[in-house]
UniProtKB/Swiss-Prot annotation:
Gene from which the chain derives: gtaI
GO molecular function, one term: zinc ion binding
Biased composition annotated in UniProt, kind: Acidic residues: 188-206
Keywords: Metal-binding, Zinc, Zinc-finger
Organism annotation: Dictyostelium discoideum
Name of the protein in its database record: GATA zinc finger domain-containing protein 9
Amino acid sequence: MTSFLLFNPGSLQQQQQPHSFSKDFINNNNNNNNNCQSSFSTPLGGSNGINNPNATTNNTTTTTTTTTTTTNPLSGSTGINNSNIEVIDIDQCLKHCGCRNPKELIQLIRSDAIENVEISWPDDMGLWYMNTIKSHEVSLQNLVEGVRVAGQLLLLDPTSARFDLSKKQKTIVVRSVNIDRSSSSLSSEDDDCCYETEEDDNGEDGEVVRSPQSKFSLLLDESEKFRKSFSLKKSSRSAFKKNKKDYHHGSSAGGGGSSGGVVVLHYDNNGNQLHYSNSMTDNNSRHHQHGGVGDGYPHSPPAAGGKSLGKRGYQQWSNSNNNNNNNNNNNNNNNGASGFVQSDEDLDASWLEEIKRNRAEVVPDLSSPALFSMDKRSPSPTLGSSCGSSSPGLNNSGNEMNNSQDSPLGVSGGNGNSLNISSGIQCPPGANIDSAEKAILEGQIHLPPLLRPRQYHACKTSKENRPTKRRKNHTSLFCRHCGTTDTPEWRRGPDGRKSLCNACGLHYSKLVKRENMAVPELSRTFELSEILNPSD
């Protein structure tokens, strides 16, 4: 900010820029040409009056150049030093996981030890809501059937999973769809189409009941299969309704007019009859020209000929007419799965833009001691509502408590966007992540898996009280002679196998050998004595 002082011999004129100061006191002491340099402070940092005793003027025109030093309102109000500011690139913080189905996503969560899963979902108005849950609350069944978050059933899209490298804890950001709202709308349409009317040979109305789709059929590729099934279901339903409508029109108009046409009356919004058509080809040509019956006028019920439609037939005809425009618009917009994929890409792009807009791009450095003296009521930089749920009509106290436990920063949701410093020293996520931690999060440094913790017994018993280890061949045996139950080997005794211990068995075997050796000698001598001395 500079001010120009113009001096003429006859008069003194002062020209200032719009943001110049109100008072300038200039003292003329000598006639030398001196360029003075003074330091000023803005109204935020200093006073408005400026005293420059060294400023001099001359009879000729001189220019006084001033250098101003401004104080940043951010550092003046919050005490944050601007020299220690780290700028985080949001594009580098969101790294795509490359998951294609729920199975790969749950394997990634388990193998990489992901701690938090941040779920985002849009509402009917296009507003995005976010909530953070623990990874142990997510399972393969939840990914297939839906995760219950804040009273809503959310279907996660594994193809949109991204690593959030801006947070200290390992976090995955996933986009989801609220299937409670979509299932309710689909169920209302299914109620209309579940019971379709068919004329039997006898002329009576029949009902066709279709079984609901199994929940576990979406296991292979949930996101892609859900989009394709939804688009195919809408197109097949509209085609089926159109065929049924043409069939009922032709059958009801068979006795009333021409055999190949149908009488259709057209009315405007006030109920005045405009014109009528008596040809099926006219209806078909308008259908191909406008992408369906696109004239915008409500149709009257078909004229009753030789046979009426019946109560259920009239209800089905009215339901098909009510949903005709919606189905035709669906057929025009969704020419296969490409239209749905395009809308999904637009949804993904808007989701990423919402995340980038709600993230903090300027993070203060905690090494500055000025952050420790910040007051709770002092203004702070605005941060996005990436933590906590701002869903309307829901109690967010439990979610905010969980989020405050997960990360040291509590950020209010909705339009608040303020930094809540509750207790102690707290920092935004990603403020203390150094290069080593970033390398670990990005996968450049691989750490060994955690070792299993040692198992400690509740109470240790002495060796005397510990039970003795049983041998593999231990049985309930005891020695028949000494009564012992512990022996290195069991031996044969008079009562059979394994009836004596090792010591008693050896002693018994020696006795048996001695007896066997003594018996033949006695018998031999006895026989010789009998031979030599035969008895009478």
